[in-house]
Amino acid sequence: MNQTGDLANLDGLGEEEANRLKSLMKLRNAMYSDEFRGWLRRVTGCGPLSAKKKDMSINDYRHGCHLLNHDDVISTRRISFILYLPDPAEPWQPEWGGSFEMYPVKEKHVPDDLPSNIVPIKWNQFNFFVVQPGHSFHSVEEVVHPTQSRLSISGWFHRLQPDEPGFSQEEEDRELQAEKEFSSVGSLISKKFMDAFVEYDEATYGGPSLPGSRMSTEHLKFLA
């Protein structure tokens, strides 16, 4: 995947460069507005969204690009979004790949192996969902078309930050605990979800020598 830096950095451009990107800045500012955040809150019931912390970048998926299954739980993310912008003159075809795939949970905080919903790409389509530890599992299907560009603007709206009105440390602590216990990243580092490591018993192991194993007397004699 090819990705730009955070579009918040557009504020640092000079006048000439900013004029070249007026449409992009207008779109970014509209999505960062109080009105748009308020609409997302009403639709999702996600609770307060930060006016300070937001992430947004342009992503270009080409041939072979994909995204593995994960739940997007990183930092204080509350809502994930994707605005699809493939070439409108040549509508994106499902057989080109790149579809957005959503997964059910087959057991507690473990995603199923197969998606339950596949969302094809369309110009100007806006997808969004509430980030939930151990639940908001999704992936991006591999792009298989040799030349087409799956262009999009994507990012995250975040929970309230400590210096914003309405911030609750108690609520934040609950969020952090849920992330630690149930997120896909947390599961990778949690001993709770790890199988115990059992070393091979070299005395009964009948296969090839394991890395780090002592050489047998027979092998030492051969090398001598």
Question: PLM features: what roles do these ranges have?
Answer:
Residues 1, 47-49, 89-94:
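Proline-centered turn/helix-capping motifs that create local helix->coil transitions or kinks
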Residues 2-9, 48-49, 106, 120-122:
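Short, functional N-terminal and low-complexity linear motifs
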Residues 12-16, 21, 25, 41-46, ...:
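Sparse, context-dependent recognition of short Cys/His-centered cofactor- or disulfide-binding micro-motifs
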Residues 13, 17, 35, 46, ...:
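Residue-level signal for well-ordered alpha-helical segments
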Residues 27, 31, 36-42, 46-53, ...:
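Active-site-proximal binding-pocket segments
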